[in-house]
């Protein structure tokens, strides 16, 4: 060790001194308090969406009133931002628990990219959602970021789970609860994830450690906007951005997002971007070459409860949908989408539902709490618009539940046509290393263009 | 928020990126905790050259730890010295900033850290 004496036992002492006492009591206590200070995972899974403003880091997101910016939005950039806030950010905040419960299986191409990274590499996952890509490669350190504080709260749960010292007990309980398939769990399968972009027909529903994993993994997560990232430029070895950029509503912003990713990685570092494809001939969504590329895609939070709680009264349908051209294809696309979604939703949701995050004590009316409790100012604009646009579709796939109880959220998507992603990489002063198509998605691995002289700045 | 992560973060404000004052961010009113994480020697040894050591020294000092040596340990040091490896692990991976603020030394903007998660969303006038 010689001259290199790091803060040793004294460091631990200092930590202990400064730390909240309860956080140090035990591993379990530490993990619990670190991931969701106020309480159990149950509370987190349901409470984040419900009480966003009360849930720590969630405040800033929901605190931005969606009605403010549109009224003052005079420049296109601000307008695009406001649009995305209403039709992407707020939606994810609202559907975070359900969304998270359906997202656990990595896309193969992404997993392959991650596994190709060297031990000790430092990577970024921009738009990490619930953090399903954290821990795929256990020998890299990854920092995930997402615009949605509620999703980041889920990702943080995952981080804590992944880094726990080996304890079979908790995991075994989860598995048992899952296999048991209690009634309670069945009642959880209310979500109908209509967007298939982060698909997951996963046989393995364990969100925490992957099956067979025995290495503890260190990762981290934070809340950030993809266009204003807090990462020091040129420091990361690699970055991924999966099913994120298609949520940006202008081409300029999509290209800028790729530019930001490239700036984060060192020279030679690689960035993988994955977006929903326009060409989905194999899927039942009905989208294909030549179709409309800018769409609002519904996410239906279904309730199968006989007596759902009332949804909060919409404050107003103040957020009139702009850009009407983006909805022109709804009639033709949504029915198929809804059907697809239902099938996918049932398949996906059944094994996992919220059981992973809250194995036993989910309130019966969880879905409605989530659907309606996110804060009217936040979700109603999207929801109201959704009702107007997708109401009939929602009914078609409800059948076994009260249609009126379903909460429909619209998410904006830009469907990439063949070649467009590569064009955007070039426009972002990047170079395409490789690219491909995987189950309704285009992907690209990009790096800095060799003549990019802005790397130094 | 791990100390490790802090070593890769700067201010989210565009104008601050080019300023040396924006890195590292300065912890303020930090409440720390220590996670119990299994050590991954291979990862640590390979991560070491990716660490900005000077920034780590600053962060470490600001968090109240004893001053780090001026020079980082070498991979060989780490490989041969288990105690050193463990110390590095404790500092980088296990030490968590649970609550507090991260302050940009350039623009002065403060980012909140709550429940161990830092929030870098900017108010509209800073975007």
Curated annotation (Swiss-Prot), chain B:
Q: Which cysteines are joined by disulfide bonds?
A: none
Give one Pfam family, short name only.
Trm112p
Query: Which terms does the UniProt entry file under GO BP?
Result: maturation of LSU-rRNA; maturation of SSU-rRNA; positive regulation of rRNA processing; rRNA (guanine-N7)-methylation; tRNA methylation; tRNA wobble uridine modification
The cellular location(s) given in this protein's UniProt record come to: Cytoplasm; Nucleus
- Cite the entry's keywords alphabetically: Cytoplasm, Nucleus
* Gene3D superfamilies cross-referenced by the UniProt entry: 2.20.25.10
Question: What are its GO cellular component terms?
Answer: cytoplasm; eRF1 methyltransferase complex; nucleus; tRNA (m2G10) methyltransferase complex
The Gene Ontology terms for molecular function here are: protein heterodimerization activity; protein methyltransferase activity; rRNA (guanine) methyltransferase activity; tRNA (guanine(10)-N2)-methyltransferase activity; tRNA methyltransferase activator activity
Q: Where is the signal peptide?
A: none
* Record-annotated TRM112 domain positions: 2-123
Assembly and interaction partners: Heterodimer of mtq2-rmt-1/trm112, forming the eRF1 methyltransferase. Rmt-1/trm112 is necessary for the solubility and activity of the catalytic subunit mtq2. Interacts with trm11; required for full tRNA methyltransferase activity. Interacts with bud23; required for full rRNA methyltransferase activity.
The free-text function statement in the UniProt record for this protein reads: Acts as an activator of both rRNA/tRNA and protein methyltransferases. Together with methyltransferase mtq2, required for the methylation of eRF1 on 'Gln-182'. Together with methyltransferase trm11, required for the formation of 2-methylguanosine at position 10 (m2G10) in tRNA. Together with methyltransferase bud23, required for the formation of a 7-methylguanine in 18S rRNA. Involved in biogenesis of both 40S and 60S ribosomal subunits.
What family does the database annotate?
A: Belongs to the TRM112 family.
Report the protein name in the record: Multifunctional methyltransferase subunit trm112
Taxonomic lineage of this organism?
Answer: Eukaryota, Fungi, Dikarya, Ascomycota, Pezizomycotina
Q: List the gene name.
A: rmt-1
């Amino acid at each position: 060790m010689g001259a290199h004496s790091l803060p040793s036992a004294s460091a631990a002492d200092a930590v202990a001194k400064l730390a909240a006492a309860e956080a140090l009591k035990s591993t379990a206590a530490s993990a619990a308090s670190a991931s969701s200070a106020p309480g159990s995972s149950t509370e987190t899974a349901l409470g984040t969406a419900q009480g966003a403003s009360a849930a720590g880091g969630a405040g800033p997101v929901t605190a931005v009133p969606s009605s403010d910016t549109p009224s003052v939005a005079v420049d296109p950039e601000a307008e695009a931002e406001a649009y995305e806030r209403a039709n992407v950010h707020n939606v994810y905040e609202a559907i975070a628990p359900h969304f998270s419960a359906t997202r656990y299986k990595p896309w193969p191409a992404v997993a392959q990219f991650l596994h190709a990274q060297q031990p000790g590499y430092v990577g970024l996952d921009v738009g990490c959602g619930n953090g399903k890509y954290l821990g795929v490669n256990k020998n890299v350190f990854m920092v995930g970021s997402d615009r949605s504080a509620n999703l980041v709260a889920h990702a943080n749960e995952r981080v804590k789970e992944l880094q726990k010292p080996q304890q079979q007990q908790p995991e075994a309980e989860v598995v048992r609860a899952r296999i048991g398939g209690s009634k309670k769990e069945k009642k959880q399968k209310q979500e109908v994830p209509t967007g298939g972009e982060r698909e997951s027909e996963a046989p393995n529903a364990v969100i925490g450690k992957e099956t067979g994993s025995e290495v503890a993994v260190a990762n981290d997560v934070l809340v950030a906007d993809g266009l204003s990232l807090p990462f020091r430029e040129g420091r990361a070895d690699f970055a991924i951005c999966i099913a994120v950029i298609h949520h940006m509503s202008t081409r300029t912003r999509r290209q800028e997002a790729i530019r930001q990713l490239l700036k984060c990685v060192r020279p030679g570092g690689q960035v993988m971007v994955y977006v929903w494809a326009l060409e989905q001939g194999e899927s039942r969504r009905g989208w294909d070459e030549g179709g409309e590329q800018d769409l609002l895609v519904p996410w239906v939070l279904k309730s199968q409860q006989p007596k759902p709680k009332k949804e909060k009264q919409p404050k107003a349908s103040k957020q009139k949908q702009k850009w009407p051209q983006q909805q022109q294809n709804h009639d033709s696309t949504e029915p198929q989408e809804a059907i697809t979604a239902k099938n996918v939703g049932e398949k996906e949701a059944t094994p996992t539902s919220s059981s992973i995050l809250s194995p036993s004590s989910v309130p019966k009316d969880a879905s409605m709490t989530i659907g309606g409790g996110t804060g009217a100012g936040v979700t109603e604009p999207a929801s109201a618009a959704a009702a107007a646009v997708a109401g009939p579709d929602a009914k078609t796939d409800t059948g076994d539940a009260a249609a009126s109880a379903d909460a429909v959220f619209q998410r904006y998507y830009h469907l990439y046509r063949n070649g467009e992603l590569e064009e955007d990489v070039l426009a972002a002063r990047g170079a395409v290393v490789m690219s491909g198509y995987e189950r309704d998605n285009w992907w690209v691995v990009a790096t800095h263009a060799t003549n990019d002289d802005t790397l130094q700045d | 928020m791990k100390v490790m992560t802090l070593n890769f973060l700067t201010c989210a404000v565009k104008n601050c990126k080019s300023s040396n004052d924006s890195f590292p961010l300065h912890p303020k009113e930090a409440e720390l905790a220590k996670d119990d994480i299994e050590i991954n020697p291979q990862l640590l040894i390979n991560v070491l050259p990716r660490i900005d050591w000077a920034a780590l020294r600053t962060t470490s000092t600001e968090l109240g730890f004893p001053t780090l040596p001026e020079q980082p340990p070498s991979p060989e040091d780490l490989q041969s010295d288990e105690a050193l490896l463990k110390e590095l692990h404790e500092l980088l991976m296990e030490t968590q900033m649970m609550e507090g603020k991260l302050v940009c030394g350039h623009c002065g903007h403060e980012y909140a850290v709550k429940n161990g998660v830092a929030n870098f969303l900017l108010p509209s006038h800073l975007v």
